[in-house]
Amino acid sequence: MNLQQKVFSYLSKLQAAFTAAVTDIITSTAHGLQDEDLLQFTTTTTLPAGLSLATNYYVRDVTANTFKVSLTKGGVAVDVTDTGTGTHTFHLKGKAILTDGFEHLELGVNTENDANLTIKFQVSYQDDAPDFNAVQSPTNQWDYVDIVDTEDKSSVDGDTGLSPAGSDDNRHFAVNKDNVRWFSAIITSWTAGTVEVNIKSNKSYS
């Protein structure tokens, strides 16, 4: 049994401005998002009614410039009842990937469009998927994890993360931890560009 999952796609913008209509349709030109991408929203003033801060939403009904969101994967579209005020921004978040039963987890990290950002990698051992975008707690257990570059064996500290600064690259890493049940990644700062993160393993515990 093999594991191969995508945490981020380089096609998806990591953040961008959007508007929302009472038809529940969110518009953001050439957003690049895909169905089931995970988002959170911020605003300079007030979000459209029906959308909340610090809340995870799943993308659905994608077109080139529009999409809707739901509170659960494949769920009912959120009912947007006004357009809000100010400038609104979506932020792409990493999905929780179930890695239980696999060892020697490997990462492919590919940056595009002169990426200037910081990305950190997260793991959890709890039974149910944690909310990697919420504060750590006894009921939401996760931590940042160290990764090792397979080219030169250099280590990237989990609390520091990986910070490409305008020079795109394709890099491979090993996750420096076994017995991981859940894995994800989070963008902690962003100026430009996109990133694709794939996790894989072809070795499972017997």
Role assignments for model-derived ranges:
Residues 2, 30-31, 125:
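Predominantly extracellular/luminal regions of secreted and cell-surface proteins
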Residues 2, 6-11, 93-102, 140-206:
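Beta-sandwich interaction modules
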Residues 14-92, 190:
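Small/polar beta-strand repeat architecture
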Residues 31-34, 102, 113-117:
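Short proline/glycine-enriched turn/loop motifs at strand-loop junctions of beta-rich domains
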Residues 39, 101-112, 186-187:
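A short beta-strand element within beta-rich, extracytoplasmic domains
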Residues 47, 110-118, 189-195:
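Extended, low-complexity, turn-rich repeat/linker tracts enriched in Gly/Pro/Ser/Thr and Asp/Glu
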Residues 74-81, 126-153:
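Acidic Ser/Thr/Pro-rich low-complexity disordered segments
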Residues 115-136, 197-202:
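Short, surface-exposed beta-strand/strand-loop-strand elements in extracellular ectodomains
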